Structures are given as C-alpha cells and as structure tokens.
Amino acid sequence: MDVRCINWFESHGENRFLYLKSRCRNGETVFIRFPHYFYYVVTDEIYQSLSPPPFNARPMGKMRTIDIDETISYNLDIKDRKCSVADMWLIEEPKKRSIQNATMDEFLNISWFYISNGISPDGCYSLDEQYLTKINNGCYHCDDPRNCFAKEIPRFDIPRSYLFLDIECHFDKKFPSVFINPISHTSYCYIDLSGKRLLFTLINEEMLTEQEIQEAVDRGCLRIQSLMEMDYERELVLCSEIVLLRIAKQLLELTFDYVVTFNGHNFDLRYITNRLELLTGEKIIFRSPDKKEAVHLCIYERNQSSHKGVCGMANTTFHVNNNNGTIFFDLYSFIQKSEKLDSYKLDSISKNAFSCMGKVLNRGVREMTFIGDDTTDAKGKADTFAKVLTTGNYVTVDEDIICKVIRKDILENGFKVVLSCPTLPNDIYKLSFGKDDIDLAQMYKDYNLNIALDMARYCIHDACLCQYLWEYYGVETKTDAGAATYVLPQSMVFEYRASTIIKGPLLKLLLETKTILVRSETKQKFPYEGGKVFAPKQKMFSNNVLIFDYNSLYPNVCIFGNLSPETLVGVVVSTNRLEEEINNQLLLQKYPPPRYITVHCEPRLPNLISEIAIFDRSIEGTIPRLLRTFLAERARYKKMLKQATSSTEKAIYDSMQYTYKIVANSVYGLMGFRNSALYSYASAKSCTSIGRRMILYLESVLNGAELSNGMLRFANTLSNPFYMDDRDINPIVKTSLPIDYRFRFRSVYGDTDSVFTEIDSQDVDKSIEIAKELERLINSRVLFNNFKIEFEAVYKNLIMQSKKKYTTMKYSASSNSKSVPERINKGTSETRRDVSKFHKNMIKTYKTRLSEMLSEGRMNSNQVCIDILRSLETDLRSEFDSRSSPLELFMLSRMHHSNYKSADNPNMYLVTEYNKNNPETIELGERYYFAYICPANVPWTKKLVNIKTYETIIDRSFKLGSNQRIFYEVYFKRLTSEIVNLLDNKVLCISFFQRMFGSRPTFYEA
C-alpha cells in the first residue's frame, strides 16, 4: 500500500492514540492508528534500576553529555567543560512517569515518535501491511511503525478536499449577538477529491415575506424544507435557519482535508455551533477514525499574556478541538503572523494580495472599461486578478476609488471589466479588490429580497476569497514544508512559536551526533547590543544608491565563528584597564586564531569594562551544524525550484526553500531567548558583535572607492578584520567593466546586514551593470570564508527621513531603466495606522514632488527647500480657508484597552464618557475612530495646548455641526513636522515652522 502523509493528530480519550491521515495513489483515504507514548532518555545505570521495568525501551548507544553552562573568568585560567560518555536508553511509556535524572526532556513527544521511527511527517511510503491490523474500512492499527514505514518512496501527487465558508448575521446595533441575531446567509466553496468545485449560498427565508420567497423561487432559487432536499448543485437555496444550520453541521462533520475560514475560529464557527445548540439543542460532533471517541466542536482560546500584542492586549489564539483529521485553518491568524500589514481586515488583505495594472479601454458616462493582461502588468498578475473577479462585485481603482462592477469578461490570460466610475484622465490605473462600498447595517435595516440576493453575492465572494488567499499564500505547500522541516504534524505547524518549532530539527541533529546538552545552572539573561545602524549622510539623493545585502548574515556569522554553547571556551571579563591589557596580551598566545576566535563584546554588568568571548573552531558546534544543514537544504531546494517544470513542483520547492530561510534566520533570535533549547547568551551577543564588524568592514572598503580605466580602487586594504590570513589585501582590483567608466562610490547608510552606497550617476542601466560587477568582486576579493553579499536593487531618488525611515523608487537587480520601479515606503507614515488619510495623501504628494525635483536636478537643496515650504504653506492655508475636505480624511483610529499606567488616562476617559451616552458601546480590544474637533469660530491656532481635550469619537451617526470645524492645525503641524524632516536646510525649516505654529520642529535623530 503506497500512501502519502497528509496530517497527524491525537485523540485524548481514556486511551490516547496518535493517528495518521494518509492518501493512496488512487485517492483513497487511509487512517492509521498508533499507540501514544511519552519519551524519556536515561543512562544505562538508571535504566537497569527502574522498577517497574519500562513499557518499551530502545538502546541509543554511547552518547556524549556536555555541560553547557557559561564559564566566566577574570583571567585566562578557564576550566575545561564537564563532559562524559555513557550508554543511553530511550524509554517509551503509555502514561506519564516520574523518572529522576532523565535528560532531553524539553523535546516534544511527537518529534521523538517521528525521529525514533524514521518517519517524515509529509513523506510517501510503501507500507508493509503485515504490521497493520484492520479496525474498520479505511482505518488500521499499527504497533510497529518503524518496520511498517521502513520503505520511503518518491513523492507523488494526491488530490485534496476543501471547504471554504463565510456567514452573514443580522445585526441592528454594532455586533451580532448569537441570542437574538439570526444567520441570514451561509456561503460555501466546496472542492471534492475529484477537483469538482461547487459554489452555493443558503439564505434564511424567515427574514423574507412569503411573497418575496415566491418571487425568489420564480427567479430560480431553490426552496427546501429539510436537509434531505438539499441540492448542492444549486447556487441559491432558501430555507429556514434551522435547516441552514443543520446543513452547516452536516458539512462540518465531513472529513475534509481542510476547512478554511477568515477569522472563523473566533466568529463564524463559534456562531454556527452556538446558534445550532440554541435553536435545536444539537451539537456538531466529530468522531475519531476508529469510531471510538466522539467530541463536540468547541473553540478554545489560548491567552499568552507574556507575549502582549498591540496596546498591551494579550496575544489570544483560537483553536478547534476536532479529532477526525480535518485541519481547521484560520487565514486571519495565519496572515497576522506571516505578513506585516496596516490592517488585517479581509478587504485590506485582498487589496494587498490581488491587484493589477489595468489599461483604460473606453470612457463612458460615469463608467469606464478596463482591460488587463500580460502586457499591462507582470505575467500572471492579470490572470490571478481575473480569477478573483469571477465572484468580485467591487473593484478599487487607484488605491481609494471604489467602483461597482457593471459587466465583466474573463479572458484567456486576463480580463475586461466595466466599472461604475467617475471619468479619470490617465490611461493606466492600479485595480485591486478592496472594500465593497456597502453598509451592512443599512442593508439589514432596509432588508428585502433584492438586498438578500445582493448580500448572497458578497457572502459567496468572501468565501471564495478564502480560496484565493489560500492559493496566493501557498498555505498547503507551506504546511507540508513546515511539517518536514520542523518535524511536526501538519495541523501543528503554525501553532507554535520559533522556540518550539526549532526543537524537532535540533533533536534530530543531537541524535545524529550522539550529543546531549545539559545545564546545571539557572539561565542568566542580560541585555546586549543589536545590529549596527548607520546615521544617514544626508536627506535627499539625486544620484542612484546601490543596495548590497549580506546573504543570511547572522546564520553565516554563527557558522564562521562556530558559535554554539558547547564550543564556547569561556568568557574573560575585566574590571580595570590593567586587567584588560594583561588579558588581551595573553589571549592570542593561549587561544591563537584561526582555531580560536576571540570576540570583543560589550560588558554584561556595569562594574565591568571589557568582555571577551572565546570560541573553539576546531570541531563544528551544534548551532553551526544546524544552520549549515538549513542553508544547504535551502540551496538544494532553490536549485530544484529552478529546474522544476510543473507548477506543483515549483510551489513545493519554493515553500521548502522559504521555510528553511525562516527557520535559519530564527536561530539567532533563539540563542538570546532564555526559554529556548538553543539559549546561549555569549553566542547571541558574539553574533551581533561579529555582524557589526562585518558591516563596518564592508562600509570601510566601499566608502570612497573609485572606478576608472577598468580598475576598481577600494577605499581600504582588504584585510580580514578578525585575524591575518593569506588572502591578497591589495585594494586595487581589475574589473570587466568598460575602461571609459569613471565613477566614485560613497557609503550613505547601513542597517544590520545591508549597505547603501551612492554612485555618482543617475543612469539606472549603468548602475545595475556596475553593481553586479561590484557584487562579484566583493564576494571574490573582499569577503572571506562563508560570507557573501548580494546586489539587491538600485534606489532612485532616495529620501532618507532618519534611521530605518526612507522613501524611494526601487529598480530590482533583474530590471532595467525601462522597467516600472516599485515605490518603497519603509517605516514612514504611509505605512502606519495611526495617521490620517489627509496626512498620507499629502505626504505622498510631497514625496512625489521631491522625487521629481531630484530627477530633474535643476535645483540645489536650498531651492528645493524653499519651493516645497512655499507650496506647503499655500496648500495648508487653502485647506484651512475652504474647509472642503471631508471628515473621513481626518479620522484616526485607536484600540481601546485598559493597560494604562494612569487610572485617569484621557483615552480611557474619552471612551468611558462615550459609552455612558451611547447604546453602541466600545468594547475592550476594539478599534474606534476619532478626530480633533474645535468650535468653528476659533481662528488659526499657532500654539496647540491640551489637544487631547479636542478628541471626539466618530461613529456612524456623527455629523459635523455648523458650529464646529476640524481642528486642522493639529493635523497640519504633524504633517509639517514630517515634511521638514525630509529637507536638508534646518534654518529655513525652523523659520517656517515657527511662523506657522509658533514653535521649533522636532528633528528626527540621525
């Protein structure tokens, strides 16, 4: 029997079992049940003394136990690490057992199961059926997984089944209550193992009149009275809410491979199950594959107060307790963890994921026709957009113009769509799927058949969006890749933090190397310095800036320095200069490079003036070996990705290489995380110290380098910053570039693992050509050992606000001057949620203007400053006088919470007062909108005081009174503060700011 592993899960009844859900080549689903064990590692001496004897025991052979406590010394008299070798046993017990002096107890039982039996969680196997006992059709029991799964076979493709769903609930206030608000719609996208896709929506007929129901039937809707009458081939079905809920129960109890929702764990599934129980007393019941355990669908929460999120709110996750092998997957939770977005609402996420440049085909009366294909945007983008358009009802044009779809045609490689849209002047616009221009509260207030049918379209679109996002993010292949890499069940891949997912690969490596790492002392936690961030040399750059990144800097630092808790010889500290000088002189004699590396770090305690960590590089340590494995596997999958021919193979290999990248980059963080199995304070701080020296070294050779006559003169000798080696240190290097090229280079910024180098040219093509040659020369002549850099991009018209804040037009390494550059806003107000739309629109306008000025190159920095400030004053005065912009542009949002130090915090007071006077109260954890409002007769106010008192909560019913105005000056001052930080002339900026607002601006720290 050939099977591919799909998912692993446990039952937690009186008799605990581990289950495998697998699929055969013919599409048949097979469940295999295994005994569940707790695992313990003990020495032979302890094993022999156990009474009663262990349930099962496996010899592990001789293993080396190393004490990895850090040795701190004030001189070079460092004691050797404690190390012992003994025969070890792996004990399996069906129930927890207290065993003294057991080791390796930090690893998960499931990881022990996989590794001890030689099973890959996502592998394909030819099962030896003599080790299988049939329980029922499709379910077997196995007591000997090692022999049963002994033959691994090449991967083969299998079909999967999915249920994507969304619901709509009636509400008359702010949020539906399961006790009073019925479900009006449930929409499903059902994909079975044959690949057949069914789209259907159930509409609650109890919210319609009998006349409307009859009209709906006349229009082609199916009306049913019971579950037995359901026809899943029909797109629209009318039924009572009880029938609607029973159909949901029937679908959710099926054993799909995946049930996918967006925030469904916290809302949709919870609402369905609670409403079902309220109206019928029934529950959604899952049964284990052996039919011996039944559990009710229950959503349980995990509150991790130690990992607080935004505004001090505890990080809460929601989980479904099923035992039938289905993976209930919440896209909302997944995207929150994997993407950094301004908003995690479905419309914002879909807008970010599904966009395409569209060409204007025709302009009509308040309507426009757009076409999109492989000529209007990158290959495949129009095709993806067209897929989403099949169920889409609204399209967002140019970021914020929401247009209703009038007609749509899905073409072979794109689309044609007619939108209800004001006439727009340009020929090319960005089209995206954002917020539908509907008000659900108003729709329920005016509810009738037409509205019910409209809502059905919105609901099925949201259900299908779950499918589109599922495919866009490649969740399925990421799940399989994560299971293989982390040695975890597919259902648990996204459940754990990095400190837990690293345990599987670490355990695998320790068993391969026959190593046990132990500590006898309490882990100490001290702060340490992070990566090097350079101060920007200037604000605006008319010349191009080349961006070079170290490839996996911290992983390669760990490999280069052999940084690991067991390779740490010791840490030498000094309390005075004499001690420091003596230690420095003797260190290199006792611990000569390259076998040893000495790393100067910042002292851990205030009474120390120096701290030096010494690592032995003769035998590769656990962390470097782990990282080398990850990086090698990533390189292997990247190579396979390039050679792959099918889209399935490409998706799998891309997910695998990405997974290895993420887990490799997480190792550095885990070295400094006290609860991690990889915790090593000296290794973590040595890693950042070496990283800082590497970025300073690269900056020193590039800052002032010159290219002429086909020769590149680096600005410094090419000396290894850690110890002398046999490399050629001559800074003059022959290039393959034309001899008439004459350029100078200047380092203008750097951050942790990247260097920004200005070239005195505005030619994109030449800049890319030179940067690629620079990359080759740096890797072959400047860098050493396993360090490599990569030319990432050319930044054109770079505007540096401060450290980690900049705006630019990015030309990637694979592009040219004819390519459409990508606008990058890093750390700026355009990417923040606590900034008004007015501010974002204005700052975007002024950055674009600055960028154009830099491109033209006709003005010096003083002229640019004068022109920008003059224009800004005109715009602000005009807006203040006309007061024409809508209130929506000035609304801000904030999360309501109670985690304030002061009991009378004005934010808390604002919400408390609002809740006293409004039936729709703002709950803890909820975002609310507010704006600064003042009396209409207040003149331009220079000196802004007590601005918190002008905050007003904006809800659906709020209207700006004739005696009120927007307190523009608050917004103008914030906007101006950001704009003056883009300009180079501080004197002019201070003068302008004082004239407008009566105070000096705050300049960002360099």
UniProtKB/Swiss-Prot annotation:
GO function terms (MF aspect): DNA binding; DNA-directed DNA polymerase activity; hydrolase activity; nucleotide binding
Induction per the UniProt record: Expressed in the early phase of the viral replicative cycle.
EC number, UniProt record: 2.7.7.7
Gene3D superfamilies with a match to the protein in the record: Helix hairpin bin, Palm domain of DNA polymerase, Ribonuclease H-like superfamily/Ribonuclease H
Keyword DNA-binding among UniProt keywords: yes
GO biological process, one term: viral DNA genome replication
Record key words, sorted: DNA recombination, DNA replication, DNA-binding, DNA-directed DNA polymerase, Early protein, Hydrolase, Multifunctional enzyme, Nucleotidyltransferase, Transferase, Viral DNA replication
InterPro entries in UniProt: DNA-dir_DNA_pol_B, DNA-dir_DNA_pol_B_CS, DNA-dir_DNA_pol_B_exonuc, DNA-dir_DNA_pol_B_multi_dom, DNA-dir_DNA_pol_B_vir_insert, DNA/RNA_pol_sf, DNA_pol_palm_dom_sf, DNA_pol_type-B
Reactions the enzyme catalyzes: DNA(n) + a 2'-deoxyribonucleoside 5'-triphosphate = DNA(n+1) + diphosphate
Function text: Catalyzes DNA synthesis. Acquires processivity by associating with a heterodimeric processivity factor comprised of the viral OPG148 and OPG116 proteins, thereby forming the DNA polymerase holoenzyme. Displays 3'- to 5' exonuclease activity. Might participate in viral DNA recombination. Does not perform OPG116/D4synthesis across an abasic site.
Family assignment from sequence similarity: Belongs to the DNA polymerase type-B family.
PANTHER family: DNA POLYMERASE CATALYTIC SUBUNIT (PTHR10322), DNA POLYMERASE DELTA CATALYTIC SUBUNIT (PTHR10322:SF23)
Assembly: Interacts with OPG148. Component of the Uracil-DNA glycosylase(UDG)-OPG148-polymerase complex; OPG148 and OPG116/UDG form a heterodimeric processivity factor that associates with OPG071 to form the processive polymerase holoenzyme.
Protein known as: DNA polymerase
Organism field: Monkeypox virus
This protein's encoding gene: OPG071
